């Protein structure tokens, strides 16, 4: 009895395994007949396409809310910014500006302090020269006797010349792409000489010339 019962239980299992056979043949027959895409398949593809479109539209709307609006051309298409090495130039410019603004502020502050110091020194020199001019005396032979000696005149004129030269050189330094040399000389550095092709820098040469002219002018006025 046990053998017969086991044979009966195995029989339906075999039938269950054999039953999908005709279904597969019908499917293959449908493909051979050219009906590869049925109505159910079309509906499934349409559903997938709708889901993808909804996802893309949701992403586009979220990105448009987060990102600023791009300018558009005449046909309505947006103008995309240029991208170099994975970085947009606007982003790189903002980063460099954020890094350089402390240096620029410090340079402006140093320039203002230098200008104030120079103005203070020139004001003191003007007061000294004015006081010395009023103290000029005449002797009994009606000969003008100046209280300024040679060394005093030389020191005052050199101070005025160096102050004017330093101020001109500082202005040229901040306004030129060539950093120049220190102490200030009219010669350009070797690496910039290869780029520009000339060994003299006109800006620094004019700064030194301004100092010389200022020294000569002060000496001429005090003599």
UniProtKB/Swiss-Prot annotation:
UniProt keyword annotations, A-Z: Membrane, Nucleus, Phosphoprotein, Transmembrane, Transmembrane helix
Claim: Transmembrane helix is one of the keywords in the record: yes
Compartment(s) of residence: Nucleus inner membrane
One Gene Ontology cellular component: nuclear inner membrane
Span list, region Disordered: 1-44
Keyword RNA-binding (UniProt): no
Source superkingdom: Eukaryota
Chain positions found as Phosphoserine: 2, 36, 57, 62, 77
Protein family according to the UniProt entry: Belongs to the ARL6IP6 family.
Protein name: ADP-ribosylation factor-like protein 6-interacting protein 6
Lineage: Eukaryota, Metazoa, Chordata, Craniata, Vertebrata
């Amino acid at each position: 009895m046990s053998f017969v019962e086991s044979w009966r239980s195995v029989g339906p299992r075999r039938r269950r395994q054999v039953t999908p056979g005709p279904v597969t043949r019908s499917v293959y027959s449908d493909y051979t007949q050219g009906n590869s895409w049925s109505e159910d398949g079309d509906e499934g593809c349409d559903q997938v396409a709708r889901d993808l479109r909804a996802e893309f539209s949701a992403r586009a709307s979220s990105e448009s809310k987060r990102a600023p609006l791009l300018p558009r051309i005449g046909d309505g298409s947006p103008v995309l910014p240029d991208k170099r090495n994975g970085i947009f130039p606007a982003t790189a410019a903002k980063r460099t500006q954020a890094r350089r603004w402390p240096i620029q502020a410090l340079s402006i502050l140093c320039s203002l302090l230098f200008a104030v110091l120079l103005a203070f020194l020139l004001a003191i020199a003007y007061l000294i020269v004015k006081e010395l001019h009023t103290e000029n005396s005449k002797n009994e032979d009606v000969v003008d006797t100046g209280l300024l000696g040679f060394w005093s005149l030389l020191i005052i004129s050199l101070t005025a010349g160096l102050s004017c030269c330093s101020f001109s050189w500082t202005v040229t330094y901040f306004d030129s792409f060539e950093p120049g040399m220190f102490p200030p000389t009219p010669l350009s550095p070797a690496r910039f000489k290869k780029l520009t092709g000339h060994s003299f820098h006109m800006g620094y040469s004019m700064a030194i010339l301004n100092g010389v002219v200022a020294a000569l002018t002060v000496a001429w006025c005090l003599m």
